[in-house]
Design a protein with these regions (language model features):
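A broadly used, surface-exposed interaction patch
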Residues: 59-66, 75
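N-terminal V-set
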Residues: 27-62
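Short, solvent-exposed loop/edge segments of extracellular or virion-exposed proteins
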Residues: 14, 114-120
Length: 125
């Protein structure tokens, strides 16, 4: 009896609202990958973002694949929103091999005031 198991690589990523974030996915094969998204690990519904190496039309505005290097199918999310937080899974289209799981956390922007004044006093006796 043959049992196939996939290697699972789990990565945590953090991004700030409005930034661009890259979620890594590498495969030694030239087989296209599927990317799916779950809002949480216990979610009952998954959204397909990419099927057979093509971004699904609903997501093409902000999501791209980094396919400039053979084997690199990293997902790039532009203008990250809080709604993008969740679990992203990349796996080879044939269903064997490595599965990449990326847990994305999104933080709000931090604003820093530029009107800070520092005064130094010299005390002499």
């Amino acid at each position: 009896m043959n049992v196939w198991t996939a290697l699972v690589i789990r990565v945590n990523r953090a991004a700030v609202v409005g930034e661009t974030v890259t979620l890594p996915c590498w495969t030694p094969l030239t087989t296209p990958v599927d990317w799916c998204y779950l809002q949480s690990e216990s979610a009952e519904r998954a959204w397909f973002l990419c099927s057979a190496g093509n971004i699904v039309s609903d997501y093409r505005e902000r999501f791209t694949l980094n396919i400039s290097v053979p084997g690199d199918y990293s997902l790039v999310i532009h203008n990250v929103t809080r709604g993008d937080a969740g679990l992203y899974i990349c796996r080879e289209d044939i269903g064997l091999g490595t599965e990449h799981q990326i847990a994305l956390t999104v933080h709000g922007k931090i604003s820093i005031s530029s009107s800070c004044v520092i005064r130094l006093y010299q005390v002499t006796k």
